[in-house]
Amino acid sequence: MKITVPELALVALVGASGSGKSTFARSHFRPTEILSSDFFRGLVRDDENDQSATKDAFDVLHYVAAKRLAAGKMVVVDATNVQPESRKPLVALAREYHCIPVAIVLDLPERVCQDRNKSRPDRDFGPHVVRNHVRSLRQSLRGLEREGFRHVFVLRSEEEIAAATVTREPLYNDRKADHGPFDIIGDIHGCFDELTALLTKLGYAVDGVAVRPPEGRKAVFLGDLVDRGPRSPDVLRLVMGMVADGTALCVPGNHDMKLLRKLRGRDVQITHGLAETREQLAGETPEFVAQVRAFLDGLVSHYVLDGGKLVVAHAGMKAEMQGRGSGKVRDFALYGETTGETDEFGLPVRHNWAAEYRGAATVVYGHTPVPAPEWLNHTLNPRVPRVV
């Protein structure tokens, strides 16, 4: 089996005592990435098999795991993890640090685990322990995804374990290898004529919805492609074409995601320009609308570019969320941060996250209209209000 894990993940090894978790971990992960419950028992009590040390050992393990995840380092938890209550803190840690929880399950026959433990004098704790491990594992195995594990891999034989490979892959938002130069364009809102005029001024060759960039340049669209303006379908055609050609990147805006929910048949409020977009799309073919739905569904919350020096997102991105993947990261990218209050128009009061930003990467974002583009703590919002 080919096991693919994100470069930043919390990997929980799951299996009965004797299933080979530690051997598997050493074969596929760096020593510094592996946090073993046995090691931490020894650390706090000088005895890796002292079960009375389990609580203290896991307190320290979770502490170290949190520090590694905060630093953007992978964590591999080498423990039995056969019960939901033992896995719950691991999923919570992954969510707290906006990384992806992965479960790799070694579901070997009980007989194999029993035989292995018999050959180890330090595992003389009776066959009932392994029996209970196997029972607990199989009772909860189907629920791992419901518990919050994004990826679950199950190995059911010694042969499968021996043949398994582990490959790391960057998150979708990792575009550090793209160095630009970039032309970053925010909040088009259906204004096709203005968009083509801007691209032309930037040196792009525009022919209808076909666009050819200047040599080496790439456009980056900050979302909110639709609503309010008169030509949302044409904006979508142009941007979708550039992304397909590899001449542009695009992140989603909150208006785009609201349109996607409507296209999926969800019940949404027809406000803030969505009525105009629906009316314009009504004149398009079902095939085009399906393409729009697929395009919007595939948009990534934010991108980290230029060796990590540049981050682009519709509504901004805090330093601790950059290059990570979680529901909270996506929500922040779409909506920014709010205070929980509403203004006199019933709209949410936005918290000025940029005033507190101290990250090393430059963050360019849109979403909130500003009187003029202004640099603030390595952030830039170029969205100037316009009359539509």
PLM regions with names:
Residues C191-D193, D227-P230, D256-L260, K318-E320, ...:
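Active-site environment of divalent metal-dependent phosphoester hydrolases
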Residues L43, D47, V82-D122:
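ATP-dependent NMP and nucleoside kinases share a basic, alpha-helical "lid"
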Residues V129-R131, P214-G216, R228-V304, K309-V312, ...:
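Active-site neighborhood of divalent metal-dependent phosphoester bond hydrolases
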Residues L347-V388:
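Conserved beta-sheet core of the metallophosphoesterase superfamily
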Residues E160-L236:
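N-terminal active-site segment of His-dependent metallophosphoesterases
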Residues S19-V75, E85, R111-Q114:
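Conserved substrate/cofactor phosphate-moiety recognition/catalytic segment
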Residues K2-V14, P31, L108-R168:
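Conserved GTP-binding G-domain of TRAFAC-class P-loop NTPases and closely related GTPase folds
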Residues A12-G18, G366:
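The Walker A (P-loop) glycine that initiates the GxxxxGKT/S ATP-binding motif of P-loop NTPases
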